């Protein structure tokens, strides 16, 4: 069996013999929510039963991103992803042993893969390249050009080539099927608690701390500027948050995520003001967990007006933090 640490493989060309003959699960896995975790748990148990390795196969970009590459979707929150590639890697690596795959395989979703038929996908990728022994999929799994492949087709070819196929029923909460789109909608509509329940953890965004324009420092509220590897996010506004840092641990604060209309921001940015904290964190990789929505973004006529509002926002965030203790 391979080492328990997650190994990331970028492309089939980097797969070696030791990556073959395993158990695989396939999908977008955007958010790695409770439904995804059921699939990972099943994959892990099947790999243990067969005494082989487990592999999660996913795609970059996500197929829906590939098929909606025009500019009309770039500012649409409904088209935003829940997690970046780096966040997906980090989340999987942090999962407990019963959920964490041995390998994470990224396939580049391009014209070639988009045009591959379901049968070609099975024979060329699953059989010839990976020589899989078992595959775990969700009950709504579709694959191949025009999404013509389904569980029945996969099972038929499993019988032909000697691999087993298992389907996992959707995970439901209050009679609603947990899905990435449902979580995205909850976040857009300020239902953080509902989103967190479906994720099984607080919604979190990770990134490096960059040097910003330091406007916050001039009004008494220095901020950490988190580099976002995305043009859109399901969250917009001001939130109470917790910053997670390997060096500094957990630090409470308040965050604004959006386009900063007071300074005519052109792109989505995440800025975090940390309470009772004056350490330098430039260049660090941090994760920001969102707890409560404070308010929507708004444009202020002056920086004095912005400063007064931030003071009120901090008071509210601290009050929420105190109530949670």
Regions found by a protein language model. Give the residues of each.
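N-terminal Rossmann-like or analogous alpha/beta NTP/dinucleotide-binding catalytic cores
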Residues: 65-139, 143-161
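Glycine-rich, Lys/Arg-enriched anion-binding loops that position phosphate/diphosphate groups
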Residues: 150, 158-258
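Short acidic-hydrophobic, aromatic-tinged amphipathic segments that line or gate anion-handling sites
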Residues: 4-14, 105
């Amino acid at each position: 069996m391979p080492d328990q640490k997650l190994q990331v493989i970028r492309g089939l060309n980097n797969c070696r013999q030791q990556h073959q003959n395993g158990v695989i699960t396939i999908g977008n896995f955007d958010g790695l929510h409770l439904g995804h975790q059921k699939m990972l748990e099943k994959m892990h148990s099947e790999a243990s039963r067969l005494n082989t390795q487990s592999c999660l196969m996913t795609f970059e970009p996500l197929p829906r991103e590939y098929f909606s590459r025009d500019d009309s979707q770039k500012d649409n929150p409904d088209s935003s992803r829940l997690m970046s590639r780096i966040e997906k890697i980090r989340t999987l690596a942090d999962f407990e042993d019963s959920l964490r795959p041995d390998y994470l395989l990224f396939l580049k979703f391009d014209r070639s893969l988009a045009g591959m038929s379901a049968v070609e996908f099975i024979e060329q990728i699953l059989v010839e390249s990976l020589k899989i022994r078992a595959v775990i999929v969700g009950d709504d799994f579709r694959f191949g050009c025009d999404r013509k492949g389904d569980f029945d087709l996969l099972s038929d070819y499993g019988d032909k080539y000697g691999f087993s196929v298992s389907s996992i029923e959707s995970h439901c909460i209050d009679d609603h099927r947990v899905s990435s789109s449902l979580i995205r909608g909850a976040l857009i509509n300020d239902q953080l608690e509902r989103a967190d329940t479906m994720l099984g953890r607080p919604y979190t965004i990770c990134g490096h701390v960059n040097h910003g324009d330091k406007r916050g420092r001039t009004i008494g509220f220095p901020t950490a500027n988190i580099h976002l590897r995305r043009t859109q996010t399901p969250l917009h506004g001001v939130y109470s948050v917790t910053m997670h840092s390997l060096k500094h641990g957990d630090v409470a604060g308040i965050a604004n995520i959006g386009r900063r209309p007071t300074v005519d921001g052109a792109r989505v940015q995440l800025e975090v003001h940390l309470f009772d904290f004056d350490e330098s964190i430039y260049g660090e990789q941090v994760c920001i967990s969102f707890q409560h929505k404070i308010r929507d973004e708004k444009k202020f006529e002056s920086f004095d007006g912005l400063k007064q509002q931030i003071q009120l926002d901090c008071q509210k965030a601290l009050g929420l933090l105190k109530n949670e203790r």
